[in-house]
């Protein structure tokens, strides 16, 4: 059978097609393999840039494996399409050129790593990207101008928490048709957005836009309404001013609008409520809005969170609004001027969890039907209002309540027993009202209660025994009531009790020793009662406790310290959340006191492992007997107030061991004997009052005691010495017979020498040996005598400090570890000689970290020696490591560390001596009373620039970066060229590393220079340093100290300067000495005084300083920006160092 030609042709074609298909598949496979190999090489190239991979994420990135098997890599169709290494903790100096050839990559996620990555590298990414997430990845620089137009396929961009600077690129919204999510939050972007073109066609896909946490300024652009599908808009924490555009009401799909923490003004536009029916979250807090709350907000029926706090909104709160808010969960209206009756319609908010009406002018009564209407309510905050009436018993029907704060109102009646039904209640705060009656026993049912703060009321009766069932209680304050009976000993069973305030009541009986069992007690105030008996020694033997997690967490405290004798006790501790500081001036019982608000923050203690009481006030009672020696075991004690009792005996020597003690008042007692010499060691002591006792003998002349006013030692007939009249010299004669002893000794030596010669003639070999031994012994005796004499001089009367070196062998021979050749052979003995035994005459300063002495060396050069405060622990290894690090830091605007030395328990640092002393002394006059030097504008500007450059170097050029923590004018020293040198950098870190017991206030800065956020958290930051140098800059410009009650009243230099700026009175901030200079011909020759070039420069300088002291850290510039801004001022560098333009 023959095959037809047609079949042959068909078979041939099939064969040819099959061969072609095999060839194509082979070529395609070869191409895919090649592309995959290229992808692998790109990823491995990126891996070589990684210097640290703590979680070994990249351990399986190997040439032997397919890149599709690499951790964090996803492939599709044999190509790499997604890289996700977010949160891996990778670090290194990287570039995106490694990813350029990944032409199938669509998703790149590298957030939360520690790269050093220049923003220009963004332009090296593949054009195929649709999703880019690089938050917290170390990006620096400006956003590239053509980035958004080049990557027009991007759907989502997240670049938050980096260090972008400069303005937003002009093409941001021009080529973003596909872009749905853009997050540039928490960078350092500046400039306005009002000039950006936002066409409707390019912004139509945008649903999420976040520019928060930058320094963007100007008004909010109307053209944002072209983003018609926008669901979330966040412009918070910027510098926007002007009004909210009325056109925002056209954003009909908007669910979240956050404009908080800006400088917006005007009324809240009613249009927002007219059309935003989908709005769920509205945050307008921390602005300058005025007017009333628009009733049109009632249209936002889906609203879940409404935050209008910290504005100047006035008028009554519209009742109709709350009736429409069926979904509302959070309502924040604090710190406004809202008046009228407390809104009764709040009971209609069935889902409401948090209601904060603090610091307004609400009046009327708390609605009786508040509960169970608002059955979900967890926090009810009403402090600092004008609310009257009683606490409604029905409040117990809000069973979810955790916090009730009714402080600073005009409530009366009694505490309803029904409050015991609130089983979840943690805080019941109602201080300063007119609440009367007894404390209900039902309080004992509150097993979760942490804070019971009822001071300044009219409570009577005794503390009920049921109260001690509240086993989780942490803060109890019944101060300034009319409570009676004895202080219950059951306080000792409260294992979490930290603050106990029972002062100014009618308690009788003795102080229960059981209080010493409270392992976490740090604050005990029993002043102004009728307590008798002795101070129980058991208090001083309080067992230390490890830190308890969450102790007093969430509390905002203020310590109102009394000054003078107008009020009893040292002061009072109050819960200050939601209360304006100026309200303290309006409280009658406090207004009669001369007081200063000394501290506010979350907690006054670090609760160290060896924690004991920090504040003890037993004044104004009828206590007898001796002050127990065990008080000296309270190693954390900072305030000890024992005045106006009937205490007798001597002051215990052990009190001088309380190295953190800052206030000690034992006045108006019957104390006898001498002031212990150990008090010389109290380096933090700022107030002592021993007046009206029977003390005798000299006041210790070393340490702080002789520097305090004489009034604090008055009416002690036998007391003498500075600051009182000199003591009669009856027992200070030098020992007799010293010279005779020396002559006898020399005679003996001469006789021995003669005998040696005779013996040498007879037995020459033996005489040589004896002579050598004898010479060595004599030299050793002489050296020992000289050493003893020199060491004795350290403890002599003229020595300005105390020493602990007795355990050190041959201390005088110890070398000073130095970082400069010319000081290589320096020994401790030479430092003693150079300071005349560290005498008071050689002391040139003292501060929180120790005393400073001027030492003149034998070659005529001078150095400064800082003797650090004596630390409680021996951290030799940490000390030496820190010194070696600090010794390597060199910059022309830093005071260089030349060397260091450890002798016994003492640590000495050797610095270069600065001829003109500190900026504080130059600005405000030296303490010696000499005439102060008047600084001109060019000198002041030069000093400000130098100090900024020094701090900038610490922040940005040191590895690791150094946060100063205590930047102030006394830590800016001036060399022979009047060049500013920052000193004491690294000290706070050193001290805190070596001594965990040191008070927080010592390590967190100096009053007047401390940024507001430090009072909410003890975490020191670089932006905190920026605030502090901003204060120094204001100090330079104004010539005023940062704190001065006579000058600023209840505010400080920062608050006063901001007020003058708001009022348009900028010129009043400038120092009068500069204005005198400014009125001269050199300033106003051509343009007139206020229009003069230099005056304009001063005002620009003021603007920079005010930016540094912004209340919000995110709005402050970093030090690179500060230096750049100061550099833009009309330069004086041409007259000084030619290199002053660089760091």
UniProtKB/Swiss-Prot annotation:
<keyword id="KW-0723">Serine/threonine-protein kinase</keyword>
<keyword id="KW-0597">Phosphoprotein</keyword>
<feature type="repeat" description="LRR 9">
    <location>
        <begin position="277"/>
        <end position="299"/>
    </location>
</feature>
<dbReference type="Pfam" id="PF00069">
    <property type="entry name" value="Pkinase"/>
</dbReference>
<dbReference type="Pfam" id="PF00560">
    <property type="entry name" value="LRR_1"/>
</dbReference>
<keyword id="KW-0808">Transferase</keyword>
<dbReference type="GO" id="GO:0010233">
    <property type="term" value="P:phloem transport"/>
</dbReference>
<feature type="domain" description="Protein kinase">
    <location>
        <begin position="838"/>
        <end position="1129"/>
    </location>
</feature>
<dbReference type="InterPro" id="IPR017441">
    <property type="entry name" value="Protein_kinase_ATP_BS"/>
</dbReference>
<keyword id="KW-0433">Leucine-rich repeat</keyword>
<feature type="repeat" description="LRR 2">
    <location>
        <begin position="102"/>
        <end position="125"/>
    </location>
</feature>
<feature type="repeat" description="LRR 1">
    <location>
        <begin position="77"/>
        <end position="101"/>
    </location>
</feature>
<feature type="glycosylation site" description="N-linked (GlcNAc...) asparagine">
    <location>
        <position position="226"/>
    </location>
</feature>
<dbReference type="InterPro" id="IPR032675">
    <property type="entry name" value="LRR_dom_sf"/>
</dbReference>
<dbReference type="GO" id="GO:0010051">
    <property type="term" value="P:xylem and phloem pattern formation"/>
</dbReference>
<protein>
    <recommendedName>
        <fullName>Serine/threonine-protein kinase BRI1-like 2</fullName>
        <ecNumber>2.7.11.1</ecNumber>
    </recommendedName>
</protein>
<feature type="binding site">
    <location>
        <begin position="844"/>
        <end position="852"/>
    </location>
    <ligand>
        <name>ATP</name>
    </ligand>
</feature>
<feature type="glycosylation site" description="N-linked (GlcNAc...) asparagine">
    <location>
        <position position="312"/>
    </location>
</feature>
<comment type="subunit">
    <text>Interacts with TTL3.</text>
</comment>
<feature type="glycosylation site" description="N-linked (GlcNAc...) asparagine">
    <location>
        <position position="506"/>
    </location>
</feature>
<feature type="repeat" description="LRR 19">
    <location>
        <begin position="520"/>
        <end position="542"/>
    </location>
</feature>
<feature type="glycosylation site" description="N-linked (GlcNAc...) asparagine">
    <location>
        <position position="84"/>
    </location>
</feature>
<feature type="glycosylation site" description="N-linked (GlcNAc...) asparagine">
    <location>
        <position position="163"/>
    </location>
</feature>
<keyword id="KW-1003">Cell membrane</keyword>
<feature type="repeat" description="LRR 8">
    <location>
        <begin position="251"/>
        <end position="275"/>
    </location>
</feature>
<feature type="repeat" description="LRR 22">
    <location>
        <begin position="635"/>
        <end position="660"/>
    </location>
</feature>
<dbReference type="InterPro" id="IPR003591">
    <property type="entry name" value="Leu-rich_rpt_typical-subtyp"/>
</dbReference>
<dbReference type="InterPro" id="IPR045381">
    <property type="entry name" value="BRI1_island_dom"/>
</dbReference>
<feature type="topological domain" description="Cytoplasmic">
    <location>
        <begin position="778"/>
        <end position="1143"/>
    </location>
</feature>
<feature type="glycosylation site" description="N-linked (GlcNAc...) asparagine">
    <location>
        <position position="234"/>
    </location>
</feature>
<feature type="repeat" description="LRR 3">
    <location>
        <begin position="126"/>
        <end position="150"/>
    </location>
</feature>
<dbReference type="GO" id="GO:0005886">
    <property type="term" value="C:plasma membrane"/>
</dbReference>
<feature type="short sequence motif" description="Cys pair 1">
    <location>
        <begin position="68"/>
        <end position="75"/>
    </location>
</feature>
<feature type="repeat" description="LRR 14">
    <location>
        <begin position="399"/>
        <end position="422"/>
    </location>
</feature>
<keyword id="KW-0732">Signal</keyword>
<dbReference type="Pfam" id="PF08263">
    <property type="entry name" value="LRRNT_2"/>
</dbReference>
<feature type="repeat" description="LRR 23">
    <location>
        <begin position="662"/>
        <end position="681"/>
    </location>
</feature>
<feature type="repeat" description="LRR 11">
    <location>
        <begin position="326"/>
        <end position="349"/>
    </location>
</feature>
<keyword id="KW-1133">Transmembrane helix</keyword>
<keyword id="KW-0472">Membrane</keyword>
<comment type="similarity">
    <text>Belongs to the protein kinase superfamily. Ser/Thr protein kinase family.</text>
</comment>
<feature type="repeat" description="LRR 10">
    <location>
        <begin position="300"/>
        <end position="324"/>
    </location>
</feature>
């Amino acid at each position: 059978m023959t095959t037809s030609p047609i079949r042959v042709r068909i078979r041939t074609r099939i064969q040819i097609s099959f061969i072609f298909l095999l060839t194509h598949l082979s070529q395609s496979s070869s191409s895919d393999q090649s592309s995959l190999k290229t992808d692998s090489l790109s990823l491995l190239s990126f891996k070589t840039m990684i210097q640290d991979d703590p979680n070994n994420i990249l351990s399986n990135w190997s040439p032997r494996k397919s890149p599709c098997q690499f951790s964090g890599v996803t492939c599709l169709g044999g190509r790499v399409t997604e890289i996700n290494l977010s949160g891996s903790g990778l670090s290194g100096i990287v570039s995106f050129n490694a990813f350029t050839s990944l032409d199938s990559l669509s998703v790149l996620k590298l957030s939360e790593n520690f790269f050093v990555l220049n923003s220009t590298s963004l332009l090296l990414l593949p054009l195929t990207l649709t999703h880019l997430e690089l938050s917290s990845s170390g990006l620096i620089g400006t956003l590239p101008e053509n980035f958004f137009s080049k990557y027009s396929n991007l759907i989502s961009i997240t670049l938050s928490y980096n260090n972008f600077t400069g303005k937003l690129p002009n093409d941001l919204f021009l080529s973003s048709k596909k872009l749905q999510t853009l997050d540039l939050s928490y960078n350092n972007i500046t400039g306005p957005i009002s000039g950006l073109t936002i066409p409707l066609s390019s912004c139509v896909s945008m649903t999420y836009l976040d520019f928060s946490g930058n320094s963007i300024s100007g008004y909010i652009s109307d053209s944002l309404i072209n983003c018609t599908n926008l669901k979330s808009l966040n412009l918070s924490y910027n510098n926007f001013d002007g009004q909210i555009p009325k056109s925002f009401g056209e954003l009909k799909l908007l669910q979240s609008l956050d404009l908080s923490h800006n400088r917006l003004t005007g009324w809240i536009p009613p249009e927002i409520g007219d059309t935003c029916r989908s709005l769920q979250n509205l945050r307008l807090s921390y602005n300058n809005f005025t007017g009333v709350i628009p009733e049109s907000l009632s249209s936002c029926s889906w609203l879940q969170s409404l935050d209008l706090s910290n504005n100047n909104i006035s008028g009554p709160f519209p009742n109709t609004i709350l009736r429409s808010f069926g979904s509302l969960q959070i309502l924040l209206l604090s710190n406004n001027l809202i008046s009228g009756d407390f809104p009764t319609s709040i009971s209609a908010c069935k889902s409401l969890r948090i209601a904060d009406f603090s610091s307004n002018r609400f009046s009327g009564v708390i609605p009786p039907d508040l509960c169970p209407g608002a059955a979900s309510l967890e926090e009810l905050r009403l402090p600092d209002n004008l609310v009257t009436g009683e606490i409604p018993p029905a409040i117990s029907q809000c069973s979810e309540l955790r916090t009730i704060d009714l402080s600073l109102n005009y409530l009366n009646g009694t505490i309803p027993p029904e409050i015991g039904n609130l089983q979840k209640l943690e805080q019941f705060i109602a201080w300063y009202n007119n609440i009367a009656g007894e404390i209900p026993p039902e309080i004992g049912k509150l097993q979760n209660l942490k804070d019971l703060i009822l001071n300044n009321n009219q409570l009577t009766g005794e503390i009920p025994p049921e109260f001690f069932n509240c086993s989780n209680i942490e803060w109890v304050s019944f101060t300034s009531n009319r409570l009676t009976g004895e202080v219950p000993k059951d306080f000792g069973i409260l294992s979490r009790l930290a603050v106990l305030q029972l002062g100014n009541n009618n308690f009788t009986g003795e102080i229960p020793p059981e209080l010493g069992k409270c392992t976490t007690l740090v604050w005990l105030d029993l002043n102004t009662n009728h307590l008798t008996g002795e101070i129980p020694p058991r208090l001083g033997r309080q067992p230390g406790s490890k830190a308890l997690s969450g102790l007093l967490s969430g509390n905002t405290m203020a310590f109102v310290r009394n000054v003078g004798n107008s009020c009893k006790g040292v002061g009072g501790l109050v819960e200050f959340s939601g209360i304006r500081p100026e309200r303290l001036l309006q409280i009658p019982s406090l207004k009669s006191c001369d007081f200063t608000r000394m501290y506010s923050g979350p907690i006054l203690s670090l609760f160290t492992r060896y924690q004991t009481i920090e504040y003890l006030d037993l004044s104004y009672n009828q206590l007898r007997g001796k002050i127990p020696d065990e008080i000296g075991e309270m190693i954390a004690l900072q305030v000890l107030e024992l005045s106006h009792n009937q205490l007798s005996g001597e002051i215990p020597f052990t009190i001088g061991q309380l190295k953190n003690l800052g206030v000690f008042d034992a006045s108006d007692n019957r104390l006898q004997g001498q002031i212990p010499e150990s008090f010389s060691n109290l380096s933090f002591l700022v107030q002592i009052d021993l007046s009206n006792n029977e003390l005798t003998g000299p006041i210790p002349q070393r340490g702080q005691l002789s520097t305090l006013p004489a009034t604090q030692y008055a009416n002690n007939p036998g007391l003498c010495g500075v600051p009182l009249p000199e003591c009669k010299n009856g027992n200070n004669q030098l020992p007799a017979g010293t010279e005779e002893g020396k002559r006898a000794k020399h005679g003996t030596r001469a006789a021995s020498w003669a005998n040696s010669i005779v013996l040498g003639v007879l037995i020459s070999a033996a005489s040589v040996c004896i002579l050598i031994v004898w010479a060595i012994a004599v030299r050793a005796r002489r050296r020992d005598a000289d050493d003893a004499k020199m060491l004795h001089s350290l403890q002599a009367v003229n020595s300005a400090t105390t020493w602990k070196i007795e355990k050190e062998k041959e201390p005088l021979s110890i070398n000073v570890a130095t970082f400069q050749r010319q000081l290589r052979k320096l020994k401790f003995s030479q430092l003693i000689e150079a300071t005349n035994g560290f005498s008071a005459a050689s002391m040139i300063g003292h501060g929180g970290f120790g005393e400073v002495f001027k030492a003149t060396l034998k070659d005529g050069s001078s150095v400064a020696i800082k003797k650090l405060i004596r630390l409680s622990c021996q951290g030799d290894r940490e000390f030496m490591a820190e010194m070696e690090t600090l010794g390597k830091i060199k910059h022309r605007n830093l005071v260089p560390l030349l060397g260091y030395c450890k002798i016994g328990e003492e640590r000495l640092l050797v610095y270069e001596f600065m001829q003109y002393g500190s900026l504080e002394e130059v600005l405000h006059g030296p303490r010696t009373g000499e005439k102060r030097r008047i600084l001109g504008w060019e000198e002041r500007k030069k000093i400000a620039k130098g100090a900024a450059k020094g701090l900038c170097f610490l922040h940005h050029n040191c590895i690791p970066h150094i946060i100063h923590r205590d930047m102030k004018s006394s830590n800016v020293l001036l060399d022979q060229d009047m060049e500013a040198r920052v000193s004491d950098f690294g000290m706070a870190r050193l001290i805190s590393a070596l001594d965990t017991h040191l008070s927080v206030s010592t390590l967190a800065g100096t009053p007047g220079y401390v940024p507001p956020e430090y009072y909410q958290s003890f975490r020191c930051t670089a932006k905190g340093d920026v605030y502090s140098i901003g204060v120094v800059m204001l100090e330079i410009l104004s010539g005023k100290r940062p704190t001065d009650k006579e000058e600023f009243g209840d505010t400080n230099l920062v608050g006063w300067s901001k007020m003058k700026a708001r009022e348009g009175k900028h010129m009043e901030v400038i120092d009068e000495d500069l204005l005198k200079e400014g009125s001269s011909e050199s300033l106003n020759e051509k343009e007139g005084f206020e229009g003069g070039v230099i005056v304009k420069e001063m005002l620009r300088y003021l603007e920079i300083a005010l930016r540094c002291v912004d209340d919000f850290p995110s709005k402050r510039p970093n030090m690179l920006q500060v230096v750049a801004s100061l550099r833009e001022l009309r330069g004086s560098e041409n007259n000084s160092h030619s290199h002053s333009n660089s760091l």
